[in-house]
């Protein structure tokens, strides 16, 4: 707490449904100033809210260090959608921890766009404590130049019949490298829990690197869980097929990349934010 430098406290009372998204903008324009915001969201029973934030720093700001924390507490029957886009400059280092705790029949949705130009690490974790609680996490990131990134998404099941789904998509170009981790943990007693995860890395350069690491830790017998992971170059057969339909190679590759990222981009709850994310993807890919 001693390192807090602002943030957001969002409290949603019991049975309150907030239709319009709550938006926040975090702008860093001083490399010497502490940049450690803390986001705290509490959604009481049967409430609902959508929260969206943007993290931005100017190109002339210098070597910004961001160390942020987001905590989300979702009470019984409540629902929280949390969308976040990070776009810090090339000299910035971004470290972000996100945590959610869901009670009985509660739901949390994570929608994360990691569009930083500098190195970053993020850890997004949901503790499904309540029976019938749900977590859905979708993360995309695009790496360029010699950027280094580490993206971890977790779901820990305590509640019976709890459900988690994690999808991470990463596109790497130039000499960028990514480590993508997905961790599903089902504790003893979480009978009939279900945990699914998918991590995929698409590389646009022979010098780009990507590791996809799915991990299932199961301490209960009566559960279902699955994972899928892939790392590879743009499919040449797909490019050839699209070019045979009249597209240029650049247009074909762009279409494949958008299709690769679409499961996350299409889930952004605000149209303008979705459009902003598409612009940032295009800018980072140099298209």
List each model region and its residues:
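Conserved beta-strand/loop scaffold segments within soluble protein domains that form the structured core
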Residues: 1-240, 244-247, 261, 268-287
């Amino acid at each position: 707490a001693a390192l807090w430098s602002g943030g957001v406290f969002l409290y949603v009372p019991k049975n309150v449904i907030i239709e319009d998204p709550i938006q926040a903008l975090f702008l860093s324009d001083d490399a010497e100033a502490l940049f450690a915001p803390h986001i705290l969201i509490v959604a009481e029973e049967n409430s609902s809210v959508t929260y969206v934030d943007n993290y931005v720093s100017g190109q002339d700001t210098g070597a910004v260090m961001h160390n942020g924390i987001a905590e989300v507490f979702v009470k019984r029957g409540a629902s929280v959608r949390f969308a976040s886009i990070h776009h810090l400059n090339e000299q910035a280092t971004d470290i972000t921890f996100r945590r959610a705790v869901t009670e009985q029949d509660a739901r949390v949705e994570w929608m994360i766009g990691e569009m930083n130009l500098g190195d970053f690490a993020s850890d997004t974790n949901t503790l499904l404590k309540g029976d019938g609680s749900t977590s859905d996490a979708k993360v995309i990131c695009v790496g360029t130049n010699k950027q280094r990134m580490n993206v971890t998404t977790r779901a820990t099941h305590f509640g019976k019949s709890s459900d988690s789904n994690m999808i991470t998509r990463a596109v790497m170009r130039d000499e960028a490298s990514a480590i993508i981790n997905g961790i599903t943990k089902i504790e003893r007693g979480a009978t009939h829990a279900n945990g699914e995860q998918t991590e995929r890395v698409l590389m646009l350069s022979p010098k780009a690197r990507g590791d996809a690491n799915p991990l299932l830790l199961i301490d209960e017998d009566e559960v279902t869980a699955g994972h899928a992971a892939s790392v590879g170059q743009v499919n040449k057969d797909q490019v050839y097929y699209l070019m045979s339909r009249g597209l240029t190679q650049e247009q074909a590759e762009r279409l494949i990349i958008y299709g690769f990222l679409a499961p996350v981009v299409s889930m952004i709850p605000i149209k303008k934010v979705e459009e902003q994310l598409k612009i940032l993807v295009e800018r980072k890919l140099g298209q």
